[in-house]
Amino acid sequence: MKTLKAVVAKYNQTSLILRILIGLAVGSVLALVAPGAGWVGELGSLFVGALKGIAPVLVFVIVASALAQGSSKLDRRFGTVIWLYMLTTFLAAAIAVITSFMFPVKVVLADAAQSDVIPQGLGEVLSTLLTNFVANPVSALMNGNYIGILFWACMFGIAMKNIGAESTKVFLANTADAVSQIVRWIINLAPFGIMGLVYTNVSGNGLAIFTQYGKLLALLVGTMLFMALIVSPFIMFIYLRCNPYPLVFRCLKESGLTAFFTRSSAANIPVNMSLCEKLDLDKDMYSVSIPLGATINMDGAAITITIMTLAAANTLGIQVSLPAAIVLSAMSALGACGASGVAGGSLLLIPMACSLFGISNDIAMQMVGVGFIIGVVQDSVETALNSAGDVEFAATAEYHQWLKEGKPLPAFLKG
């Protein structure tokens, strides 16, 4: 018993990032030497399932509790966060257009993929987003509809603030703390979940599947890395007037790494909230901005939609004009907001963007098929970019306000 306690203590004392890296290595080795050990992959499924299960409850109780206590301060910082989320998503789409023009890619179209219902136009995507605001609150919690969860949590919190007894508000605050503790327990087991996810990917997908579509994959990943390491840091520098890379690399390490394997911004919400707490951000702000970011901060999705659409146009010999490219950027940025919370969700919006150039749904669905083939890497990098950006710009808005108030930036940004 003492030995077990000692092992658990040593496990908890070890850096979470180091534990995740060890889990990554162990999962890779097990996939190579024992590809038939399906139980290892189940660890990944359980981890992602736990995160997806607790995330909607976490968002609801934290937002409702903050508003009920009367402490939620959705001031200029919140407007700054929304502006940064939307700006970077549009810039990501615009940069994807530029890189596609610089390095035009044609692909050998695969068979059309069978998928969920495809949005037929931008209006349908926006209509769905608005409808999600007033979706049944129980249904929103069950389905991970974070727009609906935020709306009803705000309504519930405001109502509770006006009519709730103090004891009820304390209970709500205690509930929020209890759910946050459960999240910390789940995140503490992340190395086992990452091990299972890596095992599933390595044992089920060989590198040979990427050979045929290597150029397309390289363009997608290269554009996402350019966005993550050049464009986003530059925007952060404009607001903070200091070296942004300590914050960038911390977000990529603690948020992006986990998101790379979960492949879901929604599932990574608890991880991001934990990171925001470490960054000393205002809980009243990040409890709203992080779930919102998981819905509207979709840099990677905008890049995927844009590049895949232009690859289809190149393959068919369609000449894309500059005005059409600008419209595509806007359509991809807005449409990407409908891809949140779904692994590979951005691929389902390719037909919508393809319709701008008169590309048939059959051809567009073949591009979706190509996307699923390279999705092991593309979707992982896309989600890492999206999720890390959620924290980066929530922190940027917060720290920008600190500078306005004469408050010093955190020590790690002063180095």
Q: Where do the PLM segments sit?
A:
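Signature of multi-pass transmembrane helix bundles
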Residues: V7-V33, S45-L51, R76-L247, K407-G415
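Membrane-water interface of transmembrane alpha-helices in multipass transporters/channels
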Residues: W39-V40, D75, L207-K215, C242-R250, ...
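Hydrophobic transmembrane alpha-helical segments of multi-pass transport and channel proteins
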Residues: A50, M86-F90, A94, V221-L225, ...
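Transmembrane helix boundary and interhelical junction motifs in multipass membrane proteins
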Residues: L58, G193, S264-N272, A302-M308, ...
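Juxtamembrane helix-boundary/capping and inter-helix hinge elements in multi-pass membrane proteins
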Residues: L67-R76, N162-E166, N205, R241-P244, ...
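Membrane-interface alpha-helices at helix entry/exit sites of multi-pass transporters
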Residues: K73-V81, Q181-N188, K278-A294, L322-P323, ...
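Helix-loop-helix junctions within the multi-pass membrane cores of secondary transporters/permeases
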Residues: E254-A336, F393-A394, K407-K414
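Transmembrane alpha-helical segments and their short flanking loops
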Residues: I307-G415
